[in-house]
Amino acid sequence: MDEITIKALQKFVTKFRDDRDWRRFHHPKDLSMSIAIEAAELMELFQWHKQSMGDRKEMEKEFKKYIQDQQLIQRIQEELADVLIYCLFLTDVLNIDLNEAIKMKIKMNEKKYPIQEVKKRDKKRE
């Protein structure tokens, strides 16, 4: 599958779901819980890994270790896909246009985090 829009991706995953008659199990509460569970599985892949604070060269070395570990990358991909699939199921059930939701949220973040106030800053704003 080549590049795909969010809408097309949503149709792709909902067809998979609907072909198996699973929509009847997709209550928003359960889908939101599934998103959290899958996100926790993603977090678990990074648990106990060293994290360099501030030293850019050390951070770059750590990133290279992640990228070179193909088994870890495969597991990360699977968990990211699970999170996104459940997000797409939830947007379908609640009839949310994810394209519009993302655009709206980015506009809100642009106001909250103006470039001139946050770019090249090392510390989080108060």
Locate the predicted segments by residue.
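Flexible "arm" and connector segments at domain edges
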Residues: 1-80, 84-126
